Structure formats: C-alpha cells, structure tokens
Amino acid sequence: MIKNDLFLKALKGETVQRPPVWMMRQAGRYLPEFIALRDKYDFFTRCQTPELAAEITVQPIRRIAPDAAILFSDILVVPQAMGIEVLMKENVGPFLPNPIRTIQDVERVIVPDVHQTLGYVFDAIKLTKQMLNDEVPLIGFAGSPWTIMCYAVEGQGSKSFDKAKGFCFSHPEAAHVLLQKITDTTIAYLTEKVKAGCNAIQIFDSWGGMLSPVDYQEFSWKYINQIIEALADITPVIVFGKGCWFALGEMGKSKASALGVDWTCSPRHARYLSGGNITLQGNFDPSRLLSPIPVIKKMVHEMIDEFGKDKYIVNLGHGILPNIPVDHAKAFVDAVKEYNQ
C-alpha cells in the first residue's frame, strides 16, 4: 500500500483534505544534486542506467517532498527503440541526424519488442519502487505520437514544426502509418511500465497546440485516445496537452483520469471546457516560481481556491525551469501542504 495516496485519490475524484502536488520535470536541472550527476554522465547514460535513473527520480522526493515521483527518462527513448537515431546535445536539446522525410523512411521505422529495446526503463522502475519504499506513487510517462513524430520528422526542436506539419499535409497516408507505429510502440511500452510498478501514466502532448482544432483531432487526439483506451483499465492516465485548451471538451469525455492544463487557460475556464467532472492538473506558470516566496504561496492558495481542492492535482503549467531556486520550488510544494491549515 502506498503510504501517501493523495495523488491516487485525486485521480479517482475522491474527496481529499488538500490537493496533491508534484511538478513536471521535478527531477531536473534546478537541483544541485542533479547537476552533479549531469556533469559526470551524459544524458542517455543517465536514462539508460537504472541506478542513475532511480537516484535522479528520488532526488526531488528527498529535497522538496512532493506527493508523487515521476520516473527520470525522456520521451525520445521511444523513437530510439524504433530504430530512429536520437542524440541529446547538453543545453541545446534533441538532435535526430536522419529525420523522416519520405514514405521510404516511414517503412524503415520498426515496431520493436519493448523488452529488448527498453528493458532498462523497466529495471529503473523496479529499482525506483524499492527506493521509494511505497512512500509516494510513481508516475511513468510517454510523449504523444504527434509530439514524437514532430521530432522524428523535424530532426530537432522547432518554434513551428512546419516540416512535421508539412509531412502530415502532403503525405497524410504515410503520416498516419508512422503515427500508428508510434502508438503501437507506446501502448506496449506503457503497459510494461505499469507491470513494472508505475502507479499512473502521463502522456505529454507538448506540441499539440501547434495544430488547428481540426488537425489536432486527426493527427494527435485520435492516437492519444487509442493509448488511453488501451491503458484505462489497468492504470489512471493523465493527458497533458500544452496549448490544447480547445480540446479539453473532447478530452473530458474520454477514459482519461485527469487532464493537464497550462497557464494560458484559467482554472474556471478549464473546468467549464472539460465538463466539470474530470480531475484537472496544473497550471502554475513555471516562470512565476521566480517571484518572492510569499507571492508564490499566495498565488498557489488562490489557484487552489479557483480550481477547488477536489478533483485537482497541483502542478505547473509546464516543466520547472533550470534557473528556479530550490527554496522557491520547495515553497511551491509547501504552500499546497499548508492549504487549509
């Protein structure tokens, strides 16, 4: 039994004394102990070495004590497993030297045996669960098929992902074949993550907001929903779409347990758009953690008041930034724990 099950209760929509709190990218570059390991080991060594991934996962639990842990990994381990080369340039981001640009490129992409290609992730989960000792739940995650495809086609990060969008619009059949391959791999991967010990799953649709509402349905939501349908009976699923407020109504009708919201959509509007029944997660502007600590705490309490304490998970509206002072991150978590006291 998980000792602190606030997060799991919120996912079920149960009444809680206070909402749970965790932060996207909480195992990250704002922590000096994370920087110490980053300086010794390259990015994918940290991801692919279970002992390192587990240690990085529990660092924020020790330091700022959120109500859930999220496994240290990366969304791009999935395309790596599918035979797409992925490099990570420190302080720059991902670089894929052989981007997918043709139908022939799509045909070369494999749907792998996830045990053979991603076994290190499942080993990291088992090790992390031992280290957590059932203190808090463990979240596993994956990128949405559309977001993975953005990197696979673009070859790197982008402000517009026009190459990825152009591929969808000029070669829609090939795009759908690629999206389905990514979806099938992701379902197998996340299923094994749950079997290995993850208590919930989050799907990151980081670039969903790049699409129009109509294109979002065709190229992103259709595939996210396949993943939800495949997993909903075995684990709670959270969907976070950055800039995807326009899809909250559709998402709210799905079997997802919770929906992540970014800071551009107000709590009340998010409740209204999502239908008012599903648990919401978010949506503190990560840059706001640079505010003075009393301001952070005041704003967190106001945010909880607006969302309501039930069917709500306190989080940021995107990942925590590397330049956030640790005591400010801890103040964010502490503010939630002080709510209603």
Curated annotation (Swiss-Prot):
Record bears the keyword Cytoplasm? yes
One GO CC term of this entry? cytosol
GO biological process per UniProt: protoporphyrinogen IX biosynthetic process
User: What broad class of enzyme is this?
Assistant: lyase
Task: Report the locations given in the UniProt record.
Answer: Cytoplasm
Describe, as the record does, how this protein assembles with itself and its partners. Homodimer.
Transition state stabilizer (site feature) positions? D74
* Keyword Cytoplasm attached: yes
Residues engaged in binding substrate: R25, Q26, A27, G28, R29, F44, D74, Y151, S206, H318
| Protein family | Belongs to the uroporphyrinogen decarboxylase family.
Q: Which GO terms describe its molecular function?
A: uroporphyrinogen decarboxylase activity
Q: Which domain of life is it from?
A: Bacteria
Gene3D superfamilies tied to this protein: 3.20.20.210
Entry-linked PROSITE patterns? UROD_1 (PS00906), UROD_2 (PS00907)
Give the metabolic or biological pathway: Porphyrin-containing compound metabolism; protoporphyrin-IX biosynthesis; coproporphyrinogen-III from 5-aminolevulinate: step 4/4
Q: What protein is this chain from? A: Uroporphyrinogen decarboxylase
